[in-house]
Amino acid sequence: MNSVNNIRSTFLDYFHRNGHEVLSSSPLVPRNDPTLMFTNAGMVQFKNVFTGLEKHSYNRATTAQKCVRAGGKHNDLDNVGYTARHHTFFEMLGNFSFSNYFKEEAIFYAWNLLTKEFCLSKDKLLVTVYHDDDVAAGLWRKISGLSEEKIIRIATNDNFWMMGDTGPCGPCSEIFYDHGDKIWGGPPGSADEDGDRFIEIWNLVFMQYEQLSKEKRIELPQPSIDTGMGLERIAAVLQGVHDNYDIDLFRTLIHASQEIIGVKATGDFFASHRVIADHLRSSAFLIADGIMPSNEGRGYVLRRIMRRAMRHAHLLGSKDLLMWRLVPVLISEMGQAYPELVRAESLISEILKLEETRFRKTLERGLGLLNEASTHLEEGDYFNGEVAFKLYDTYGFPLDLTQDALRRRGISVDVDAFDKAMKRQKAEARANWSGSGDCVTETVWFSIRDQVGATEFLGYETEKAEGIITALIRDGEVVDHIDLGQKAMIVVNQTPFYGESGGQVGDSGIISGANFIFEVHDTQKKGDNVFIHIGEIKTGQAKKHDCVELIVDSARRRKIRANHSATHLLHESLRQTLGSHVVQKGSFVSPDRLRFDFSHPKSISSEELKKIEDLANDIVLQNSKVTTRLMAIDDAIAEGAMALFGEKYGDEVRVISMGNNLEQTGSKKWWSIELCGGTHVQRTGDIGLIHIISETSVAAGVRRIEALTATAARLYLHGQDRRVYEIAGLLKTSPADVQERVQTLLDERRKLEKELNDSRKKIALNGGSVNSQGDIQTINGISFMGGVVSNILPKDLKALVDSGKKKIGSGVVAFISVSEDGKGSAVVGVTDDLTDTLNAVDLVRIISVTLGGQGGGGRRDMAQAGGSEGGKADEALVALKDSLKG
């Protein structure tokens, strides 16, 4: 069968047999490419190869590249689920030549694969070429035997590809498949080309020019090839279906969602199942590649995708959390081709659970507000864009969900008004932003780099060196000298000072010359390896070209080394304890402490934290040698070295290995092995001790631990011991019995608090020490009971109102509790026989307004609210009674 997995394998095997290096898909987050939000084409990982900035041992390559188009210029989100071929996630099959073969081989390889390997009928295929590309047209005739009418010349930019305003570019040749005359549409270049009969399945880009400017284009001395074929599209063709969502992969995912929800993918529910299947793929792959849902950047796009799928699950009537239950099905289909999915399965599931749980609350609130704001609208009307923006800005309800919810009613959103509101808010934010205060722009550092070269770093071998001053910067300007008392920056041709990078802070110390002493407070690495020593002249005057001695503060560096090495041990401990889904998301290494951020969907138990700490300290006690090696990156990865997600590494990397893998699991010799450019201890015993002092949440799916090492850890633990002894003295017990004594006191306190609350409720219900409003009154024919009480918890206040409802039988009960800090909490109850005419939510909001609150919520029979002005509790009850008078 031509399954998706078989088609992918056939493509890669075919090009491997034809001399191409089979490479793994690059991550969905482009490495060191700020121009792209997500990888959206196969050629993205080869940009620097095409432009000549990178060289590799191969000159032919083939990939199955995972791609996402859901933000920025390439945004298919709104169409997904409603068309046959729009996806947020897709796979791009490609073959690439880097100054090796060109048009003839590219055309031959494509034609041979389609007609011989995939056995497509020649009669079903036609091609386009750029209108003046006679060479490509001639080669198509020669290789395929296609007639002239099936080699269509296109004069538009659809058949000319450019990387950007400048850079490599060239004509394209697209291959189309004819689905037959039962489907409307004409061939490319015709009036009916927008129909669905003729579908592009493969694009061959012939990079033969370099665009130097808008007016100037020259021939490349060594042209290249970049091709791309959508796996989902070719799968539809080979499986004899016209719709991508009818291929085996999507049929399996949609069948699973139908089984779980119990609703078939027909009629109004057809698009929703397709949205869920597509968005599951993009969500899972983005999480596996290290993206976590958030309110900005890539994380926000992921959250939009996830929530759109969850919104459609809601439309299908899904009572339980859905998305995470589909993850095993997805991994069964795609895990073999993409093992990162398997490794991240638990993380993907937990993040989807967490996000869907949160979103259900947002959805319920947002849909209620949306329905309230759109009740007067009819089919063909426009929904107010300002209101849509308020839903987004205040309640976290994204625009695309508003559009989706209104689409079924035939109502559009005034997107222009939404955009204007968004721009207005951004302008206000910019006006209120004071900036970073950094007076030196990056261009200064690059200018220095061009003039004097990069700084040579000597700090791995020594903490003391000699050098020559190559640049001085004061107040953001390059100067020739700096004088006593002035704060400045010094650049030296070589330095033992480590410049802040990789989470490790910069070194401090002394730079001295014949006539000056400069105290270094910090060292930064700027503009392509220019090391900036930041500090103050303590004596004399420093000049450009002065010979200097540089001495690092070795005691401070020693503490930093211990903390940095500890992060490596903790990283491996976390992975062994929590799972292989743990990936470093950030770190901060200073002389005082270390901080380590990592992917994990939930808080860590005290037992897990103890195990993590114990594992790391076991390696410290080994006192094994820490090994530093320079290796080819492929060899390092093969040996098991962990690389930081999103970092771009050269062909040669620095590898730090720690600890003996005593269990000899697999082929891994070292306990911890990572790519790292930081400074480290010589033996693990130099770390002394590792103690975790906190574990917190940083963002959805990202946790943080903070830890101390060596003397700092010892002093911290001594302080903890001292506090335990002091507390034991206060409690008149021994340190060993402190926990038991505290538990006894807490139990006694809870018992007394319960007795006190019970007494307050009885007093309030019987009209005791509350004011006279505690009596039952009749207002406009309605029985009313209410009062003001002190320091009753909200849950007890509800119980008090329930008791009141039973006591009066029919009517309204309202109690307000005023806490010691002056805040007011109110609960209003309406007996069931009156809920058709009275709404507890409306009544409690009257109280809330008087108390200075923001409204309230609940059901028609019971609602609660609060406010900061508890002193107005009596006034609030009067306002409520006045409302009952009508």
From Swiss-Prot:
EC number, UniProt record: 6.1.1.7
Enzyme class: ligase
SMART domains membership: tRNA_SAD (SM00863)
One of the protein's GO biological processes: negative regulation of DNA-templated transcription
Residues where Zn(2+) binds: 564, 568, 676, 680
PROSITE patterns given in the database record: AA_TRNA_LIGASE_II_ALA
GO molecular function terms listed in the Swiss-Prot or TrEMBL record: alanine-tRNA ligase activity; aminoacyl-tRNA deacylase activity; ATP binding; tRNA binding; zinc ion binding
Record text about domains: Consists of three domains; the N-terminal catalytic domain, the editing domain and the C-terminal C-Ala domain. The editing domain removes incorrectly charged amino acids, while the C-Ala domain, along with tRNA(Ala), serves as a bridge to cooperatively bring together the editing and aminoacylation centers thus stimulating deacylation of misacylated tRNAs.
Xref: HAMAP family: Ala_tRNA_synth_B
Name of this protein: Alanine--tRNA ligase
Organism: Bartonella bacilliformis (strain ATCC 35685 / KC583 / Herrer 020/F12,63)
